[in-house]
Amino acid sequence: MRIGHGYDVHRFAEGDFITLGGVRIAHHFGLLAHSDGDVLLHALSDALLGAAALGDIGKHFPDTDPQFKGADSRVLLRHVVALIHAKGWKIGNVDNTIVAQAPKMAPHIETMRALIAEDLQVELDQVNVKATTTEKLGFVGREEGIAVHSVALLQRP
């Protein structure tokens, strides 16, 4: 059994939506990133890669590589899943915490869980997504960006 932790942050930038957990959410900012900026799927990918001792997303999908410009993070996550399966691991469960002052996440969480479960090839009850604020403290509280913590448990079949 292996446990991995992932963490990612993206700052807000000009735009009118963000993508989190594969869900497009209307917002008065976008997220600054080389790919689609899905900070949730980036943190989750790092947690999975870390648990399998396969490095991090920067190693597999460098932001200096033009092929990943604007990349769909769901496609990247599916590639990560293929890598961990190739190493003989299966996913036990994943737990994700979105840290954001805005926008409100509650209306989108069940859709995020369903999309993530699909991409991970696991049951819905193996995927948790929750959200919290920082009570207006720090860069998140000032609405300068969004952070996500992810934990993944891998097991041998």
Curated annotation (Swiss-Prot):
Biological process per Gene Ontology, one example term: isopentenyl diphosphate biosynthetic process, methylerythritol 4-phosphate pathway
Keyword DNA-binding: no
EC number: 4.6.1.12
Cofactor: a divalent metal cation
GO molecular function: 2-C-methyl-D-erythritol 2,4-cyclodiphosphate synthase activity; metal ion binding
Alphabetical keyword list: Isoprene biosynthesis, Lyase, Metal-binding
Superkingdom: Bacteria
Reactions performed catalytically: 4-CDP-2-C-methyl-D-erythritol 2-phosphate = 2-C-methyl-D-erythritol 2,4-cyclic diphosphate + CMP
Gene3D superfamilies: 2-C-methyl-D-erythritol 2,4-cyclodiphosphate synthase (3.30.1330.50)
Enzyme kind, highest EC tier: lyase
Record carries keyword Plastid: no
UniProt pathway annotation: Isoprenoid biosynthesis; isopentenyl diphosphate biosynthesis via DXP pathway; isopentenyl diphosphate from 1-deoxy-D-xylulose 5-phosphate: step 4/6
Similarity comment: family membership: Belongs to the IspF family.
Annotated function: Involved in the biosynthesis of isopentenyl diphosphate (IPP) and dimethylallyl diphosphate (DMAPP), two major building blocks of isoprenoid compounds. Catalyzes the conversion of 4-diphosphocytidyl-2-C-methyl-D-erythritol 2-phosphate (CDP-ME2P) to 2-C-methyl-D-erythritol 2,4-cyclodiphosphate (ME-CPP) with a corresponding release of cytidine 5-monophosphate (CMP).
Protein name in the entry: 2-C-methyl-D-erythritol 2,4-cyclodiphosphate synthase
Organism of this sequence: Pseudomonas fluorescens (strain ATCC BAA-477 / NRRL B-23932 / Pf-5)
Gene (name only): ispF
